[in-house]
């Protein structure tokens, strides 16, 4: 029998663990932005493939509005939006410590501040980090 628990997952941004996750089955969404390999079919039915060099990726996280990680990510966003040479690149590491799934994103940026929604109930804040290079390795268990 195989098992999974979100308690075995760790997400770190610039060395700080992200906490205060929202509910749902998609609170962490990590993917490459483009296909690694594309193909073209010739008029004679032969196929040619092209192996791309674009390894950029997207890392989306959904947090509760009460998550302390919102303040941390807002601080990075503020530094990135400031003029001058204060730009802070974002580095991301995700790991499932049980299965050993691993995603490492380097030289990234926060795409925009999280949307601010408030009402009678608590809400979710979603952040997207775009990285220049995203390396993925899937489970050993």
Where are these regions (language model features)?
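Short beta-strand and beta-hairpin "edge-sheet" elements
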Residues: 30-32, 91-140
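Short secondary-structure capping micro-motifs at structural edges
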Residues: 43-50, 74-80
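Polar/acidic, low-complexity leader/linker segments enriched in S/T/G and N/D
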Residues: 1-31, 137-141
